[in-house]
UniProtKB/Swiss-Prot annotation:
GO terms for cellular component: cytoplasm. The gene is argS. This is Arginine--tRNA ligase. Transmembrane segments: none annotated. Keywords: Aminoacyl-tRNA synthetase, ATP-binding, Cytoplasm, Ligase, Nucleotide-binding, Protein biosynthesis. Belongs to the class-I aminoacyl-tRNA synthetase family. It comes from Shewanella sp. (strain ANA-3). GO terms for biological process: arginyl-tRNA aminoacylation. A motif ('HIGH' region) lies at residues 126-136. Disulfide bonds: none annotated. It is an enzyme of class 6 (ligase). It catalyses: tRNA(Arg) + L-arginine + ATP = L-arginyl-tRNA(Arg) + AMP + diphosphate.
Length: 581
């Protein structure tokens, strides 16, 4: 509905240009907003005030002119001017009912799909050779929710799990395996079953022994030179580490697969060419033996230009070099229209610099959008980064295990007579959903406090509340199995029916915000409001005990569309629904 009003206003502006009311080259950014007070209509715009200067008319006069020139629309019951020149639109109830009716049988719930694009999404991207920890949660689940929503809206999405599968940490691991094999022979391979312990032991040796550290660096060189033995061991480390990652993805209900892995090592063969091309364009500068690029717009507090280091003095490459190679690949090979990077906000300057350099060096097409969608940190209840009691990094599997244990206790307390298998399945869904939703419901750019107590509450904007809200709506149809709705029509008469209908009609514009800005919290907020609107409707408007069949059938259709929307919305967040709790 919002997009329909915007379209009417766009047509009006074109008419003004043809009439000479506005300059022929005038471009306006049309903003239409939902009203909070329904006495002011359903939608409003301040367009008249925005056009005042260009049209040379006062806002109220211009508002009336806009209304007089609006194309006819069955969706609009009336239009009014308010205050200094706001234009308020009242949506026709029967047109809204028809829109909702059509949405029930549509797999996209009546949403008008945008022009499809090819969109690369870079997310999760853990460093291999050790297990995933809580710091990987946000990129993984925020990215996956946006990916799901993009695909639902018809875009071609290419997932890119840009894992850290290359670098000095592998030299350290290779050196440690070499030592173990010298001591224990092939039995040393068993040590890899616990990769985290293996990594910590190797790191300890690296920090304590200069000789070991030297050997580790030598092995990195051998690995990069294609040494067969080093490459074989490297593949084993990666395979074990990726297996750990995909066990976590499966538990989280994340859609990444092995086929989506395109890590740092995939660009090794391209790095030398990146350096040559930057040099050929005269962009490279020598600084303390390293090859760097200075860009005038990036300076420190002292006003000194900040470098992008492309190649170290020892010949090694850095993240920037790999990122530039990846951007070129995503532009020239994957033909991306947009590339979204779900990476910690602390990397903002890095991405600003490499995005700018990629455009400057023409590594990417001018029409390709590069977007860093950064996120804040997950903190403990003390407000500091989330750690174990001993100050260590919290493994993601340990966090999920605790969520499952707490959810099982909660579900059992509410269902003491339920069988263990059903309890376990409900607890699995509730536990994982609680962790994911607690994160996704927060503004992506904000830090947030991780609290099991809050996220497992059945009150407020939480996963348990929404899962229960869905079962409550779906439960109506368990009591209405013999009712034929094939000929039923939605009729909006009661104020709470209209409120619910208006909320349902907003689903498409909410999803547009999710994919345009990478903000799943907007969808979470909408689903919470939708559940509240249904609750108010259900209390005020008897469904199965309605006054007549026409009213009952209409309210059942509204309930069905609510259930469909809640389920689809939760699924787009990567959250399973339950039929009972």
């Amino acid at each position: 509905m919002k997009s329909h009003i915007q379209s009417l206003l766009e047509q009006t502006i074109e008419s003004f240009k043809q009439q000479g009311i506005l300059p022929a080259d005038f471009e306006a950014r049309i903003q239409v907003d939902r009203t909070k007070d329904k006495s002011h209509g359903d939608l409003a715009t301040n367009l008249a005030m925005m056009l005042t200067k260009a049209a040379g008319k006062n806002p109220r006069e211009l508002a009336q002119l806009i209304i007089d020139n609006l194309p006819a629309s069955n969706y609009v019951a009336k239009v009014e001017i308010a205050g200094p020149g706001f234009i308020n639109f009242f949506i026709d109830d029967s047109a809204l009912a028809n829109q909702l009716q059509a949405a029930i049988s549509d797999e996209h719930l009546g949403i008008k799909l945008p022009t499809p694009q090819t969109i690369v999404v870079d997310y999760s991207s853990p460093n291999l050779a050790k297990e995933m920890h809580v710091g990987h949660l946000r990129s993984t689940i925020i990215g996956d929710s946006v990916v799901r929503t993009l695909e639902f809206l018809g875009h071609k999405v290419i997932r890119q799990n840009h894992v850290g599968d290359w670098g000095t940490q592998f030299g350290m691991l290779l050196a440690y395996m070499e030592e173990l094999r010298a001591q224990n022979g092939e039995q040393a391979q068993l040590e890899l079953s616990d990769l985290e312990t293996f990594y910590r032991a190797a790191k300890l040796r690296f920090d304590e022994s200069a000789e070991f550290a030297t050997r580790a660096r030598q092995l990195v060189v051998e690995l990069q030179s294609g040494d067969e033995y080093c490459n074989k061991l490297w593949r084993e480390f990666n395979d074990i580490s990726l297996s750990h990652c995909h066990e976590v993805y499966e538990r989280l209900g994340v859609s990444l697969t092995r086929a989506d892995v395109h890590g740092e090592s995939a660009y090794n063969a391209d790095l030398e060419q990146v350096v040559k091309d930057l040099d050929a364009q005269g962009l490279l500068t020598q600084s303390n033996g390293a090859k760097v690029v200075f860009q005038e717009e990036f300076r420190n507090k002292e006003g000194e230009a900040l470098p992008v280091i492309i190649q170290k003095a020892d010949g090694g490459y850095l993240y920037a070099t790999t990122d530039l190679a990846a951007m070129r690949y995503r532009s020239s090979v994957l033909k991306a229209d947009r590339v979204l990077y779900f990476v910690d906000l602390r990397q903002a300057l890095h991405f600003q610099q490499v995005f700018s350099l990629a455009k400057l060096a023409k590594f990417v097409r001018n029409d390709m959008s590069l977007e860093h969608l950064g996120f804040g940190t997950m903190n403990g209840e003390d407000g500091r980064p989330f750690k174990t009691r001993t100050g260590g990094v919290v493994k993601l599997v340990d966090l999920l295990d605790e969520a499952n244990t707490r959810a099982l206790e909660l579900v059992r307390s509410k269902n003491p007579d339920m069988d263990e298998a059903t309890l376990a399945e409900i607890a699995r869904v509730v536990g994982i959903s609680a962790v994911k939703y607690a994160d996704l419901s927060k503004n992506r750019t904000s830090d947030y406090i991780f609290s099991f107590e809050q996220m497992l509450s059945f009150e407020g904007n939480t996963a348990p509340y929404l899962l229960y809200a869905y079962t409550r709506v779906a439960g109506i149809f368990k009591r209405a199995t013999d009712i034929d709705l094939s000929q039923a029509k939605i009729v909006l008469e009661h104020e709470k029916e209209k409120d619910l209908g208006n909320k349902l009609a907003q689903f498409g514009e909410i999803l547009s915000r999710v994919v345009d800005k990478g903000q799943p919290h907007v969808l979470c907020g909408y689903l919470y409001e939708l559940a509240g609107a249904f609750s108010s409707f259900y209390e005020a408007c008897p469904v199965l005990a309605a006054d007549n069949d026409e009213q009952k059938h209409s309210r059942l259709l509204l309930s069905q569309l609510t259930a469909n929307t809640l389920q689809k919305g939760l699924n787009l967040l990567g959250i399973e629904t339950l039929e009972r709790m």
